[in-house]
Amino acid sequence: MDKGKENRAQGVLKRISGPVVTAVGLDAHMYDVVKVGNEELMGEVIKIQGENIIIQVYEDTAGIRPGESVGNTGLSLAVELGPGLLTSIYDGIQRPLEVLVDKMGNFIERGVSAPGLSHEKKWEFVPTVKKGDEVKAGDILGTVQETNIVHKVMVPPKAKGGKIKKISGGSFTVDETVCVLEDGTEIAMLQRWPVRVPRPVTQKLNPDIPLITGQRILDGLFPIAKGGTAAIPGPFGSGKTVTQQQLAKWSDAEIVVYIGCGERGNEMTEVLTEFPELEDPKTGKPLMERTVLIANTSNMPVAAREASVYTGITIAEYFRDMGYDVSLMADSTSRWAEAMREISSRLEEMPGEEGYPAYLAARLSEFYERAGRVISLNGEGGSVSVIGAVSPPGGDFSEPVTQNTLRIVKVFWALDAKLSQRRHFPAINWLNSYSLYLDALNEWYDKEVSPEWNPLRAWAMGVLQKEAELQEIVQLVGSDALPDEEQVTIEVARMIREIFLQQNAYDAVDTFCPMSKQYDMMKAIKHYADLARTAQTGGATPQQVIGIRSKNELPQIKFIRDYEPELAKIMKDMEAEFDAMRAV
C-alpha cells in the first residue's frame, strides 16, 4: 500500500459479521482502504449508509470486537508496479508470500503488511531517451533487464509529461528518481495503480492473431485470439486446472499471470513446485521467469478472492502497456462469485438467482472487458488474453456463473466428465465447445499455416458431428448395420479423436504440439479418408479399408519430436497397401 500521507481519521467498530464489519464515526469514501481493529487488519469500504461505513476485511476477523478503532488510510486498494514483479508469488492483496514466510514462518499471521516490490534491491536502469526529449503519459523512459524479459520503465499514465530536465542510467532502487521533468515532476521506476480502474489505452484493436497454445483441440478446432476471452467450465475432476496449467506453460504469450482464486492449496503447490523446474521452450530459461503467481487458496479469507482477481488483471495490463502479449489464467472465477454471494448475503442485499447478487453479471463483465489487444499510450501494441475456469456445482452449465460468463466470453471450452472418465484428455467436448474468433483468425491460418488448414478443420468437425449422429444407431444395432461408407466415417472419426484430439500433458513431446505438426497430422488422417473412399468406390469392403495396418502406426507420431521421416514412411506404406488392395 501507499506509504504517503495517511489520512488516519478514526472511527469505531459497531458490528462484525464474518468478513464484513460496520464502523461509525469514520470519514471515508467508497473503496478507501482502512485498518480495522487493534491488530490493524486490512479492509476496504464497500458501502456507505448514512453514518454506517460497511467494510470488507481481507483477513480473518476472529477475535475483534465492537468498540475497537478503525483508521482510514485515505487511499484506494492499489498495486505496486515495477521491476521485481516477475517470478514473484503474491497473496490476493499483493503481499509477497516469500517475504511473509521469512517474517512469520509457514502460517500467515494477521495484520502484517509487506510491500509488493522490494524497496532495497537495486536494478540497472538503461535510459532510452535523453535530456531535452519531450515525453508524455505512458512513454518509455528506459529499460531494466529483469529476467530474460526486458522491463520497460514508463511515465505513469496520469502524469502530465513534458521535457526531460535530467535522466541518468545506473543502479537504482524502485523508489529512487530516475528522471526529472522541467516542471519538477520526479519519476521513479515504481508506479502505483488502483486495482479497480482499467489502465488507459489509445485504441482497442480487432483480435486477429491466435494465441497458440500447443494443445491440438484448442489451436485446431476452437482457437482463442490474442486479447481474447475464454471460459473453461467443467465439473470436478474433469481437468480444468491441468488445462489452465498447460496454457500457462505453453501458450505463446510473453508474460503469464496465474491467479489461484479460491482453489485447493495442493493445486497451487503443484504450480509453485513445477513452474520453477519447467523450461520455457522459446528461451530455454525457467518458466517462472515470465510468470507472476497470485496464490489465494480456498482457506484464505473470502474477501481477498475479489482482490486477487483485480490485482492479477492490473499487473497483466501493466505488462501489456510495455508492448507484451500477456495471458491471464483465473482459476476459478466460480470461487470469486461464491465470495461475492457470501458478502452480499452478509450485507443483507436482495439475492438474485441461486443466491448470487443481482450485480454478478456486471462484475464478471467488468473483469473480462479488461482483456483485449490494444495500442497503449506509448504506441506499443500489446494484449491481455483472459482464460477463466468456471466450476459449476455438479457440472450443471445452466447455473448463473456459467451462463453469465458465456454471455461475455467468445470462446467456450466445455469440459466433460464422461470424457475424463473414459480417460480422454483434454476432456473438452468438441460438440458443445465453440470459438467465435474463427472468422477473424482464418486469414492468419491461411498465411501462416496453409490455405488448406481452414477446409481441413471444417472437414474434421463435419466428421465428428456425423459420428455423433450415427452413434445412436451404432448403440442400438452395432456398426455392422451401417452402410459401408458410414462404417468408414465412424473409423475416421475415431482416428481424429484418438490421434488428433487426445493429448498427453505428461509426455515430454506430446505436451506441446506446434501448428505445423498439427497440420501434418490432420492432413495424414484426411489422406487416409480420401484413399478409403476411393478404394470403396473401387469395390473394397469396409473391413478391408479399416484393416489397413499402416494407419495403426499414426498415433506414434504424437510422441516423436522429429516426426517428418516417420510420417512420410507411414504415408508411403499406406498408399502401397491401398494400391495392393486395388490390384486384387
From Swiss-Prot:
Q: What does this protein do?
A: Component of the A-type ATP synthase that produces ATP from ADP in the presence of a proton gradient across the membrane. The A chain is the catalytic subunit.
What Enzyme Commission number(s) apply to this enzyme? 7.1.2.2
Q: Which UniProt keywords apply?
A: ATP synthesis, ATP-binding, Cell membrane, Hydrogen ion transport, Ion transport, Membrane, Nucleotide-binding, Translocase, Transport
Q: Name one GO cellular component term.
A: plasma membrane
- What membrane topology does the annotation report for this chain? Peripheral membrane protein
Record-given protein name: A-type ATP synthase subunit A
The record's annotation in InterPro entries points to: ATP-synt_VA_C, ATP-synth_a_Xtn, ATP_synth_asu-like_sf, ATP_synth_asu_arc, ATPase_a/bsu_AS, ATPase_F1/V1/A1_a/bsu_N, ATPase_F1/V1/A1_a/bsu_N_sf, ATPase_F1/V1/A1_a/bsu_nucl-bd
What does the UniProt entry say about where the protein is found?
Cell membrane
